[in-house]
Amino acid sequence: PGKSSEGYKDLNLKEWFFKVHWPGDPNMPGMLQIEALTQISSLSILTIPGNKGEIMYLVSANDLVFKKKIIPGSRFFMKSDVISFKRGLATFKAKGMVNDELVCSATIKLVLPKEIKQYKII
């Protein structure tokens, strides 16, 4: 908690997005990859004692890199490291891998509303 988080998703041809992205060349949409990295990132903060049941909101996703397609039958492994967490704002470096090869990465910023409410923002 508070340092890093990781997880994976086994993808099969029955995933709804493979039917439409793209017919004849099914692969996981980039924005769903970023969504998965964002959700994994949030776990680093939401597992800190006192944050159970809280939610985080996406502030930004930058430095997006998509290197390879993620196809049916892949295990999409995600890892996220907390770069900073101050005043309710968290910054993460996240990456996705398939077969130990980097397939995507991003710098993600999330906000924890219960924390940021106590600071006056102009």
Feature roles, as predicted:
Residues 9, 79-82:
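Short, hydrophobic/aromatic-enriched beta-strand segments in well-ordered soluble domains
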Residues 1-3, 70-74, 81-122:
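HotDog/MaoC-like acyl-thioester-processing domains
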Residues 22-29, 34-43, 58:
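Compact, glycine-rich, soluble single-domain proteins
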Residues 1-28:
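Catalytic strand-loop segment that frames the active site of acyl-thioester-processing enzymes
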Residues 40-79, 103-113:
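Hydrophobic beta-strand-centered segment that forms part of the acyl-chain substrate-binding groove
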Residues 14-15, 24-29, 53-55, 77-78, ...:
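Short, low-complexity, polar/charged sequence segments that are solvent-exposed and flexible
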